[in-house]
Amino acid sequence: MGSNSSRIGDLPKNQYLKKLSGTESISENDPFWNQLLSFSFPAPTSSTELKLLEEATISVCRSLVENNPRTGNLGALIKVFLSRTKELKLSAECQNHIFIWQTHNALFIICCLLKVFICQMSEEELQLHFTYEEKSPGNYSSDSEDLLEELLCCLMQLITDIPLLDITYEISVEAISTMVVFLSCQLFHKEVLRQSISHKYLMRGPCLPYTSKLVKTLLYNFIRQEKPPPPGAHVFPQQSDGGGLLYGLASGVATGLWTVFTLGGVGSKVAASPELSSPLANQSLLLLLVLANLTDASDAPNPYRQAIMSFKNTQDSSPFPPLIPHAFQINFNSLYTALCEQQTSDQATLLLYTLLHQNSNIRTYMLARTDMENLVLPILEILYHVEERNSHHVYMALIILLILTEDDGFNRSIHEVILKNITWYSERVLTEISLGSLLILVVIRTIQYNMTRTRDKYLHTNCLAALANMSAQFRSLHQYAAQRIISLFSLLSKKHNKVLEQATQSLRGSLSSNDVPLPDYAQDLNVIEEVIRMMLEIINSCLTNSLHHNPNLVYALLYKRDLFEQFRTHPSFQDIMQNIDLVITFFSSRLLQAGAELSVERVLEIIKQGVVALPKDRLKKFPELKFKYVEEEQPEEFFIPYVWSLVYNSAVGLYWNPQDIQLFTMDSD
């Protein structure tokens, strides 16, 4: 580094880095800093190069760790950066490319060093390196600066206050990355951290007043999806001056500095993937999720979560309730549009879940939208391609549907939205179908996939809960959706019979041999019977509440009437079978009277006529099916590892050695 283009492999031998990490103290006013920060660094373009950068940084850090307690050079570098950021806003307004470029380079070095420090040492050691203060002879003051706190406040100020221009885009991304790196101490602990330097600095003291402004800025960065400026927008004039400063950065920018924005961290995702078309938006979203999922401090709730829970629409002129901390306003229409467009990434789906679950203002706004298909369709597409998604992404998508189906208005309106030609649904050509029927099809497909592959009870529960919430409001079900409901019941029935047979054989086997351990078929039977009962309750709920709206379901029920015969006298299902049995018997009688060889159209006509004559008072009333999503106790045990796995896999230009990661296993999704 310094006044030449640098290559990763040369970093440990670089004279400027050697001096920085050496035994000589460097004053913050030394011309050395201008030389160190005037580098054209071809930024890593693959995970291999990011790994090389990490290894080179470790080499420099070893010397720095050894010498910094005596030299204080890390503190001097940070002070140089802090002093420069005071003029950054003015430099942006004056288009001072050189000043911004050097300030960015200072932050880039700090970020690289901080990342290794956090991985390699305890929080106590880290703080010692950031609180060094040179004392003159006879000065016994114990007041030392806390440069880590100053750095964090400065980063928050930079992120929130510096205008986003072509020349400031890069330093804005670097500031967000450095905050992510500061929080990354969680990666190196198996247990969720409940007390750390993150809590110390970000939840109290001078950083706290920036909370709402930071959350708002990160959300707007996500909303705007600003792309990095083209290479030509950031070219510096070539000068050959005797001072050795390198002002000719054109080649470095074109081939290097901007390419950092096409990286996806480990695995190096291709630049064309949607979440990386805007590195600033991607990095902002990851930082926002990390902040929102920090555990509460011992003496105060997480202020970033408070901000996310309470912000309002810019169109809402009502006053904020008293005692609401960190409140702000944001354009809900823009946020809704961005959320609809970005659902291909885990992190955008997790943000949608977080907002729907925690912010009642957002939830009310979304449920009142007349274009809910723009939000629901991307969620259904995630579930449809379940085999290509990780299980966490599928869970989030399902829970979003469950939260939406808690609202009766949503359950009614989705059957009024008619869709044409759903191209991603490949099992059958759907030229025209309601959003409600499509939702049913996709959820049932997810259940069937789970039954044959993952066999996850939690997934089953959420799918069935969403269907149950909707069931009383089923309207004009598409014939294919009606068929799939009964087909799922058929599949469950076959599975029940198979497990019952296995249980019987197992019981016989246990009587003849006491030595061999046998599978717990009784538990399997119990689970499958719970699911069957739930399906019967869903069918019953539709028949008792909206029979006249669903001739296709009655048709499918009659077509497969034999399926239900075995459950009529079963003690677990007798009560719920009464209404289904009544409907089957009533309409079967009508069809019998109409004669044989009836066309599909004629059968549907008889069903529609029969609905009017069916004595509704004979249908037994059951409690309304209503399920509400409730987060499990200690949700942070799920969400914190999940969020950090997203950072690990998706953060732009950040690499961590997988062998150092303690929070989650590398093969987990």
UniProtKB/Swiss-Prot annotation:
Lipid-carrying residues in chain (N-myristoyl glycine): G2
Membrane topology: Lipid-anchor
Intracellular or extracellular location(s): Cytoplasm; Golgi apparatus; Membrane
Key words of the record: Cytoplasm, Golgi apparatus, Lipoprotein, Membrane, Myristate
Post-translational modification: Myristoylated in vitro; myristoylation is not essential for protein targeting to Golgi compartment.
InterPro entries xref list: Dymeclin (IPR019142)
One GO process term, biological-process aspect: Golgi organization
Pfam families referenced in this protein's UniProt entry, alphabetically: Dymeclin (PF09742)
GO cellular component: cytoplasm; Golgi apparatus; membrane
Role noted for this protein: Necessary for correct organization of Golgi apparatus. Involved in bone development.
Subunit structure comment from the entry: Interacts with GOLM1 and PPIB.
Record family assignment: Belongs to the dymeclin family.
PANTHER family: DYMECLIN (PTHR12895:SF9)
Protein name, entry field: Dymeclin
Organism: Pongo abelii (Sumatran orangutan)
Gene designation: DYM
